[in-house]
Every structure is written in C-alpha cells, then in structure tokens.
Amino acid sequence: VAEAMQMGISTGLALAGFIPVTIYPRLDFLLLAMDQLVNHLDKLECMSQGQFRPQVIIRTMLGATYPLDPGPQHSGNYLMALRGMLTNINVWSVSQPASILETYRTALESMRSSIVIEVDRDKRLEYR
C-alpha cells in the first residue's frame, strides 16, 4: 500500500466535493502519509485563504498486543504528536465501542477533516 498516495487521493477527492473515509489499519501506517497530512490536508484552508476546506475522515487503530503482539513497529501511540502537529484536523481517540458510531457522526458533521483512532480495550488505560 502507498500510504502517502492514499492520503493524497483522499485530499483530492475532498477538494472535488466528496467526503472520503480513508483507512489505515494501524496508527503506525499513518506516519507514512505525514507529508500529505501535515503539509497539505491540514494547511489547504490556510494556503487557499479559506477558498478550499477539504474534509477527509481518517480511520485508524491503536491495536491490541494480546493474544498476538504486533511488535514495536505496529503498536506505537502517536496521539499527542498528531494533536500537536495538526491545527485544522480534529483528532479523536475512541475506546468505548458504544461511542464509535457517534464519533464518526460527529466527524461527518464537523465540516473539518478528522482522525478517529479506535483504541483497543487492552490499550485503553495505557493511552489516555
């Protein structure tokens, strides 16, 4: 998978009026799309002086380490780093299954790009 291309295509679709939902199976994979995310999607509204306001919903997961440990390359938590780098993109962490659907509804209605990080139950207490 070409993660940067995936984010670039999603941004392009958003500029064309669509609201794409793009999925990165692990939060670590989103790191490979950081140029498109930080330097393009997050800054397009500012760079275009408000003319363009692309909305992309990004789904990713901070996964379980039990029963199968994905190892250090697939279990990094970059939630706070994302919140620090992104000024025009909502970053949400969801750990309760009952609130996942509502979080996606909020992301859709927010009129802004959003990252929804689904946190597996065994990571919930470790990464608040």
Regions found by a protein language model. Give the residues of each.
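Conserved thiamine diphosphate
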Residues: 2-5, 11-128
